[in-house]
Regions:
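Juxta-kinase regulatory segment immediately upstream of eukaryotic protein kinase catalytic domains
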Residues: 1-21
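A short linear hydrophobic-aromatic micro-motif
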Residues: 17-22, 273-277
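Active-site acidic catalytic loop and adjacent metal/ATP-binding pocket
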Residues: 27-40, 44-45, 86, 196-244
Length: 328
């Protein structure tokens, strides 16, 4: 598929004068930086077709995408976070359907405002300040989604017990194609069974569940010139336990920075280190979700075999009750 041809077709629904395309990446979406030479403004164009079948989900549907734009607007218009605000097309819609002549169905696309800055590298000179600010930003996001009535019933993925069962079914394929052994798969089952127990415990805690980002990684945090961390790429956002985001964010920090991150978080929202066992389990869940995204893609799943072999002993230790938060 000629992606730039598709991108140009999408932009016919917007009021660009002289667009210049810069391909960024193709993971859960095809993304381009689009700069309009007519006014020198830049935007992020997302064409919602995934690089591998494992990424596809409700987040790629019209309802799912419209729900994501609601989240971005709620965050931006209420001044909660600086986010990439959605841009309406010439018909007043935030999601644009597009189909080339050789395509059987529409592909959806969205256009977002561009945020200038650099992706978080963990090598910044003022690292402690930025890590603390990431904790603050995440807490503010969680406080808002916990309280916002507008965000309670969006059409988004759900990261609960059923998601774990679905993930385990997908991971069985890894044994079938000899990516890892049945013994390794059995340990994954044990780990995720414990995680399901953790989820049931958390469900009895007030305010433990709500709309979360789910994909906080270094490439999804932009550090602006004034050192403000901005979360981007809410494509996988959905309903889950808030500790899931704390876990994801923790793993992008080196161990010695994690307490600084947690200090930033607790400056705005409640969190106790007594919850670290829960956080560890949800980190392991996020790892297995990532395996499931790629497990059937023979071109892109080669890293999983090595990763399992390097991490399986740690999983065993976690099953015995050992703390691994600062090792993950």
């Amino acid at each position: 598929m000629n992606y730039e041809c598709l991108a140009r077709k999408v932009l016919e629904s917007y009021s660009f004068i002289d667009p210049v395309f810069e391909f960024l990446r193709h993971n859960e979406n095809i993304t381009y930086k689009v700069t309009d030479r007519g006014n020198n403004c830049s935007f992020l164009l997302r064409i919602h077709t995934s690089v591998t079948e494992g990424f596809y989900g409700i987040q790629h549907t019209l309802d799912g995408l419209e729900s994501e734009t609601v989240l971005l607007q709620e965050l931006g218009l209420n001044g909660v976070l600086r986010v990439q605000m959605p841009v309406a097309n010439r018909f007043g819609k935030y999601v644009t359907g597009c189909r080339l002549e050789n395509m059987d169905a529409d592909i959806y696309a969205t256009l977002l405002e561009w945020i200038d800055g650099d992706t978080f590298t963990h090598n910044e000179e003022n690292l402690d300040e930025i890590v603390y600010a990431i904790g603050v930003t995440l807490a503010r996001f969680h406080l808002f989604t916990r309280a916002s009535a507008a965000l309670k019933k969006l059409n988004r993925p759900v990261y609960g017990v059923e998601k774990i069962d679905n993930t385990l079914e997908k991971l069985r394929h890894g044994v079938e194609v000899d990516i890892y052994s049945m013994e390794h798969y059995g340990i994954m089952i044990e780990v995720l069974t414990q995680v399901k127990g953790i989820m049931r415990e958390l469900d009895s805690h007030d305010g433990a569940w709500g709309l979360i980002h789910t994909d906080i990684q270094r490439g999804n945090i932009i550090i602006t010139d004034n050192c403000e961390p901005c979360f981007i790429d809410f494509c996988l956002c959905g309903y889950g336990h808030y500790l899931f985001d704390i876990g994801s964010a923790s793993t992008i920090m080196e161990s010695k920075q994690r307490d600084i991150f947690l200090k930033g978080y607790t400056s705005q929202a409640p969190f106790s280190k007594d919850s670290l066992r829960y956080v560890e389990g949800l980190i392991l869940m996020s790892i297995f979700l990532c395996y499931a995204f790629f497990i059937r893609d023979s071109v892109r799943n080669g890293w999983i075999k090595d990763h399992v072999e390097r991490k399986v002993e740690m999983w065993k230790e976690w099953l015995t009750g050992k703390e691994i938060y600062y090792l993950l």
